[in-house]
Amino acid sequence: MATSDQDRRHRVTRNRPPIARPSTSSSRPVVSPPRSKVSKRVLLRVASVACGIQFGWALQLSLLTPYVQELGIPHAWASVIWLCGPLSGLFVQPLVGHSSDRCTSKYGRRRPFIVAGAVAISISVMVIGHAADIGWAFGDREGKIKPRAIVAFVLGFWILDVANNMTQGPCRALLADLTENDNRRTRVANGYFSLFMAVGNVLGYATGSYNGWYKIFTFTKTVACNVECANLKSAFYIDVVFIAITTILSVSAAHEVPLASLASEAHGQTSGTDEAFLSEIFGTFRYFPGNVWIILLVTALTWIGWFPFILFDTDWMGREIYGGEPNIGTSYSAGVSMGALGLMLNSVFLGITSVLMEKLCRKWGAGFVWGISNILMAICFLGMIITSFVASHLGYIGHEQPPASIVFAAVLIFTILGIPLAITYSVPYALISIRIESLGLGQGLSLGVLNLAIVIPQVIVSVGSGPWDQLFGGGNSPALAVGAATGFIGGIVAILALPRTRIQKPIPLP
């Protein structure tokens, strides 16, 4: 970071009154023992778990909103199923971050949480994949609504959201620990994380777009589980293997130094943990410097923009481009598969952008890059609205397949959105890790603070997007319009309010 930025942060720290903290020893920031700089290869292996996490997340994003509608939940309420994601992020992510900052396990602070999260992910996707079979075993039969299968699905879905938050946060915190507040190394590590997210997305969306898994895993098709269900189940079997491989690669690469359980700090530690946690995460807000609040504001606006797309991307393709409905004909499932293909191409662009991230931020400044990416996101959402409008007036819906030009436009928009998505997955985490270090927070808790700016908007979108869309006659365009507006505003704020610092070319990493 440039000298002027360092001086600014030091002045804020010097003029700020001391942060009031509980008297318990657990509230004191955890300081890791000094270590030598880790190599890029180690950072790469540690970040690899993001590939396994994102593989399952890609399946979740591309297939589960359509699938839950096939189980009988109306489109207007499908977004409510996703409510657990932001709710678990609101509570689980900060709690896990706080706990991992103070974990005294002999295996390290972060790795136990990564492994536990990976196990929970594996269990949850098995429950989701077998939801129809579980529902059948407990009395579901043929019908439009399968209530017992829905209960099993929602249970597995919510466990999956909790597990994703339990795994991803400690992994990012571990990368921050290993880079030891080196600005460039932090950006590089987050770039690696985004790169592996892109690889996981490509593989996950490719898996979700293939309709022949039930022919390979023939046992997955049952009396309760049709072809679409069997393909989903098969994809999750692959996910379990993939998450196991990447978790082993990640945790075996990081050599964490366990925290010493000092007898002098033992007194009162267990009794004051919750109080200290709440005090740290909320009590420090008023001491944040202005640029931290700008980062949190832009993050919130960005995610109000992204979440409607994340919820309904393949559903938008199936309904508004292919003109289908769940459980009626083949148009909807064909649209979902094409949407998954578009998301796979999206992930290719995400990966390319992740590789170029460091150079872009060094040349133009992280705030400027973030702002431009948000404006690009808003333009793409506007393009989706225009494409839906044109498709609805061509007269093919309900009679024939969409014209190639409409499909091409939709897939192109999905693809281009990979560029701003890569920025969203990387730049805010790097900025927040660097800028609030002076507050004395551990990396796990600092990322939990940023997570609040992500999940609160997601709660709002999850609750409001379905009724909001119905207010304007259904479809996904109203929520996308809100996303375009907030994304554009966030981009302007980032460009104008975040320092456009150009970083000098650094010495190559070892």
Swiss-Prot record:
Q: What is this protein called?
A: Sucrose transport protein SUC4
Task: From the UniProt record, report the name of the gene that encodes this protein.
Answer: SUC4
Does the UniProt entry include the keyword Ribonucleoprotein?
no
- Location(s) in or outside the cell: Cell membrane
Q: What Pfam families does the record tag this protein with? A: MFS_2
Which parts of the chain does the record assign to the membrane side Cytoplasmic? 1-45, 93-111, 170-187, 255-291, 357-365, 424-443, 499-510
**Can you tell me which family this protein belongs to?**
Belongs to the glycoside-pentoside-hexuronide (GPH) cation symporter transporter (TC 2.A.2.4) family.
Provide this UniProt record's keywords sorted from A to Z: Cell membrane, Membrane, Phosphoprotein, Sugar transport, Symport, Transmembrane, Transmembrane helix, Transport
* InterPro entries for the chain: MFS_trans_sf, Suc_symporter_pln
What pH dependence of activity is documented? Optimum pH is 4-5.
Annotated catalysed reactions: sucrose(out) + H(+)(out) = sucrose(in) + H(+)(in)
| Record keyword Membrane present | yes
Residues in coiled coil? none
